[in-house]
Amino acid sequence: MEVSVLIPAAGNGLRLGRGPKAFLQVGGRTLLEWTLAAFRDAAEVLVALPPGAEPPKGLGAVFLEGGATRQASVARLLEAASLPLVLVHDVARPFVSRGLVARVLEAAQRSGAAVPVLPVPDTLMAPEGEAYGRVVPREAFRLVQTPQGFFTALLREAHAYARRKGLEASDDAQLVQALGYPVALVEGEATAFKITHPQDLVLAEALARVWSA
């Protein structure tokens, strides 16, 4: 794949309470190893690690020191990217199929910006204090995943704009959208869930036993 894969993996995993997620073991492999396996066909893979972390050897990636936030880490990776198309992926989403990568890549090549999404399966409710509040139509919402694909020049412009305006976002699509550039949606996958809480590890361990991308 003629694409630069950017993996911000410099987070400290505070919510999970197990140290940096990149080195968390699931099914006998680290999340970083699972993630890199999903992008083994990419021409370039760049990973941002926590400051002071020892870069793993033999994984076929270039390792850089990450920033204080996810956004800062992606910005550093972007500076090092050498190809005209990038995929940005969270290391906490280790189970990424080749089909999902292909869909995002194809849409990004066509439109310049693309993200995978899933419909919301549960009822969405805005609570009123501690009481049941207004139900929000779930059909109007989507869960946003990674990998997210962009023209490299476009994402660099979006990050530069965010720095000028003092914008901070939880993903890169928000920064591109802030430029007024449309972001295409493609079908996501439930297996590409984000490991955030301890209960997510139970699902991840079960999936690791049967996973084949």
From Swiss-Prot:
Q: What class of enzyme is it?
A: transferase
Site entry: Transition state stabilizer: R15, K21
Protein name according to UniProt: 2-C-methyl-D-erythritol 4-phosphate cytidylyltransferase
Tell me the NCBIfam families matching this sequence.
Answer: ispD (TIGR00453)
Q: Which keywords fit this entry according to its UniProt record?
A: Isoprene biosynthesis, Nucleotidyltransferase, Transferase
Might you name a Gene Ontology BP term for this protein? isopentenyl diphosphate biosynthetic process, methylerythritol 4-phosphate pathway
Q: Does the keyword Nucleotidyltransferase apply?
A: yes
Q: Name one Pfam family in it.
A: IspD
Function description: Catalyzes the formation of 4-diphosphocytidyl-2-C-methyl-D-erythritol from CTP and 2-C-methyl-D-erythritol 4-phosphate (MEP).
Feature type site, description Positions MEP for the nucleophilic attack: R138, K194
Alphabetized SUPFAM superfamilies for the sequence? Nucleotide-diphospho-sugar transferases
Check the record and name the InterPro entries matching this protein: IspD, IspD/TarI, IspD/TarI_cytidylyltransf_bact, ISPD_synthase_CS, Nucleotide-diphossugar_trans
Question: To which pathway does this protein belong?
Answer: Isoprenoid biosynthesis; isopentenyl diphosphate biosynthesis via DXP pathway; isopentenyl diphosphate from 1-deoxy-D-xylulose 5-phosphate: step 2/6
Q: What GO MF terms are annotated?
A: 2-C-methyl-D-erythritol 4-phosphate cytidylyltransferase activity
